[in-house]
Amino acid sequence: MAWPLKLGGVVALLIYLSGCASVRLDAGFDEVKASVEERSKAQIVWNSGSDLDRQVDERVRSLLAGKLTADQAVQVALLNNRQLQAIYSELGVAQSDLVQAGLLRNPIFDVAVTFPTSGGRADLELTAVMNFLDLVYIPLRKRVAASRFEETKLRVTGAVLAFAGQTRRAFYIHQANEQMLELRQTVVQALSASVEVARRLHEAGNISDLDFARQRALLESGKLALRSAEAALSQSREQLNMALGAWGKATEWQIDRRLPDVPVPPMETEASEKVAIEKSLDLDGMKQRIIAAGEQLGFAKATALVPDWGIGTRGERQEGPFSVGPILEFPIPLFDQGQGRSGRAAAELRRAQQEYYAAAVRIRSTARSLRDRMQAAQDRALYYRDILLPLQEQIMNETQLHYNAMQIGVVELLRAKEQQIETAVAYVEALRDHWLARTDFALLLSGRLPEGSGVQVGQTEK
């Protein structure tokens, strides 16, 4: 009876060691937080129902009470958006998988009682079996789960940075819509004054019905453009509200109604490809996916022939006293020799490797494309600001003088006004495009491919 006692002692020790494993649902968040702060200069907090949450709420209210800048809007969104809080829970899921990978499977305890049909004493059989091969396979499973946990941390970090970039884009789009609305309001006011003057001239017989109708048509077109600008502003405000996690009185925030001018000096673009590759969370995540796929292949090969090996004890009582003996259980690999599992793991490893190389090419191409796009948008905005806008203003002033001197007709005057309006609209659009391109370029250099640039960490099923 000595060996069953020793076996029982080993089982008890394993049960004790397994019971020591625990799950920290916030595991890995400190690393994510540090990486986000280093890459974006913004802070994130995982709500825990503590005093820290109240401090965060107070900070959010304080920021929303003032006039928001783009940086402040991003900070509010990172602190206040509930979707981000849900994303952080992915860390707890991955940590739970890592803990689970380090646990032994529970022993199987079986009891069988048979009653002789002729009467007499019942037969009793007790069996306890445990898969001790788990002791060999646990390190392999843990390495796979650890790589996936690292990938999850990178994916969550990338999701936070992407969300910050989306919030910044929403801010600039809304700010451009504010400026566009202000422009359209100014245009309608000016056109209304022009129509009123034209009305008096028409009543006095100094301009024809056709010229007066053209003035009115231009005003009505301006009013229609104003309504479109109001609708666009309402939509962009709600987009920003969603990003900020704002509702109720919190939606009464204000921002500057004009886009900032093109910054001087411009954003540094030297070695952008190198920086994008070195900082890429997408590539780092794919490296972890390759590591996990390699570990999974090793695990599949190791368990191909003998995935289970049960060792246990059996006690049986029939007519006499209990008889006790060992049990050894293992599958005989006659049909399933793990070919499918090994082949799948090898294919997933090859896929992960090829995706990594494809992503590296995509990141380099995106860096060049965004650099050129940002430079083109900047040149376009500066060209409108420094050349076309002053030129259109000069043309409008000269046209007005010629019209007042009755040297040209109302058609030429209206055409000059339309050109001036369209140039101003184009300038706002060019300035908006510059800030959007700058946001995407900065996001790439912080380590995340902008939305629409291709497959990112976590998009491919494992």
Name each model-derived stretch.
Residues A70-A73, N80, I87, N131, ...:
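Amphipathic alpha-helical coiled-coil segments and their boundaries
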Residues S192, S221-G248, E355, A359-I363, ...:
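Short segments within alpha-helical structural elements
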